[in-house]
From Swiss-Prot:
It catalyses: 7-phospho-2-dehydro-3-deoxy-D-arabino-heptonate = 3-dehydroquinate + phosphate. Belongs to the sugar phosphate cyclases superfamily. Dehydroquinate synthase family. HAMAP family: DHQ_synthase. It is found in: Cytoplasm. Binds 1 divalent metal cation per subunit. Can use either Co(2+) or Zn(2+). NAD(+) binds at residues 71-76, 105-109, 129-130, 142, 151. GO terms for biological process: amino acid biosynthetic process; aromatic amino acid family biosynthetic process; chorismate biosynthetic process. Catalyzes the conversion of 3-deoxy-D-arabino-heptulosonate 7-phosphate (DAHP) to dehydroquinate (DHQ). Zn(2+) binds at residues 184, 246, 263. InterPro entries: Dehydroquinate_synthase, DHQ_synth_AroB, DHQ_synth_fam, DHQS/DOIS_N, DHQS_C. This is 3-dehydroquinate synthase. Pathway: Metabolic intermediate biosynthesis; chorismate biosynthesis; chorismate from D-erythrose 4-phosphate and phosphoenolpyruvate: step 2/7.
């Protein structure tokens, strides 16, 4: 399966194919001339796949160096970025060389940020290994790292030269790591794809069902994001729809402590909680919050978080990139398969969170 991201300046393809990881070297060679490659990964994914990917790349004539960092959201910061810069400098990486991001969303976000800023930008590709990364973060060119005060507050827009997705690697994920990716999948069904929502409604929510339908789930999710990114690369309009559930979700991730609530879990919480607010304001139809919550629960996703620290959540919301003065742009779902943007006063948001 192939999806074309037909951007005017940086078009690229998304390849979705079971077993594709075996041919990663040939795929990269179809994009780049043989050169030096920095393979950026974390200690967990690296232990599973780094050597195989390195050998595949070397077989095609690439010189490969591997940068490993400690897995998890807590590593997605400027300290790790600086270590990566020093590694690239030490290994003589130039602007004609490239980066291969091998891992989940943390690896992809960090490696993309490093690639887009090292020497003012070098080429990179994404090889996502988690469901969250395969359906969401590897596509669209958003890169970024966290600070103690806010998630993804430091970042760039930088498109990869390609994305290679092998659904087979999902079989090595733990149950929680697989299920959290369904938070983003549910989001795609809600904002733009009622057929995807229907598929999710029809399957039983088990790990087996997710893996059995993984190619279709990944393809439909990627296609939603592809369409939106092509229409609005730099988030001037409809790309905001992709943030459904993320406003409160990011606040939950931050206040809980990075890594304690996984990203897809936080998105699920955020979707349910913002829908609850929107229902109370009559911006969404009555009963839709219950539908969203039931879908999330079916896949084992959380819909609430304890302890619910309103003051800390409110402070996090004020630091959100979507905050404008005394209000914040939020995404709502007036009906399944359709999204809209609404401006909610921050004080009002706080009042709803307290109830």
């Amino acid at each position: 399966m192939k999806l074309e991201v037909n951007l005017k300046q940086n078009p690229y393809d998304i390849i979705i194919e079971k077993g594709a990881l075996k041919g990663v070297g040939q795929w990269v060679k179809s994009l780049w001339e043989p050169q030096k490659i920095a393979l950026i990964t974390d200690n967990h994914v690296g232990g599973l796949y780094a050597e195989k990917v390195k050998l595949s790349l070397e077989h095609e004539g690439f010189e490969v160096v591997v940068f490993n960092f400690l897995e998890g959201e807590a590593s997605k910061n400027l300290k790790t970025v600086n270590k990566a810069y020093e590694f690239l400098i030490k290994n003589g990486m130039t602007r004609s060389d490239g980066i291969v991001a091998l891992g989940g969303g943390v690896v992809g976000d960090l490696a993309g940020f490093v690639a887009s800023t090292y020497m003012r930008g070098i080429h990179f590709v994404q090889v996502p290994t988690s469901l969250t990364a395969q359906v969401d973060s590897s596509i669209g060119g958003k890169t970024g790292v966290n600070t103690p005060s806010a998630k993804n507050i430091v970042g760039t827009f930088a498109q990869p030269d390609g994305v290679l997705i092998d659904p087979n690697v999902l079989e090595t994920l733990g149950k929680r790591e697989l299920i959290e990716g369904m938070g983003e999948v549910v989001k795609y069904g809600l904002i733009d794809d009622p057929e995807l929502w229907q598929l999710l409604d029809n399957i039983d929510g088990s790990v087996h069902s997710i893996l059995e339908n993984s190619e279709t789930i990944i393809y439909r999710s990627c296609n939603v994001k592809r369409k939106i990114v092509v229409e609005d690369e730099f988030e001037g309009g409809v790309r905001m729809y992709l943030n459904f559930g993320h406003t409160i979700g990011h606040a939950v991730e931050q206040t809980a402590g990075y890594g304690k609530v996984m990203h897809g879990e936080a998105v699920a919480i955020g979707m349910v909680q913002i829908s609850r607010v929107a229902e109370k304001k009559n911006l969404m139809p009555q009963g839709i919050t219950r539908q969203i919550a039931e879908m999330c629960v079916k896949f084992g996703l959380p819909v609430d978080y304890e302890p619910w620290r309103v003051e800390e959540l409110y402070t996090a919301l004020t630091h959100d990139k979507k905050a404008r003065g005394n209000s914040i742009k939020t995404v709502i779902v007036p009906e399944i398969g359709k999204a809209a943007i609404n401006q909610i006063p921050l004080v009002e948001m706080k009042e709803y969170l307290e109830k």
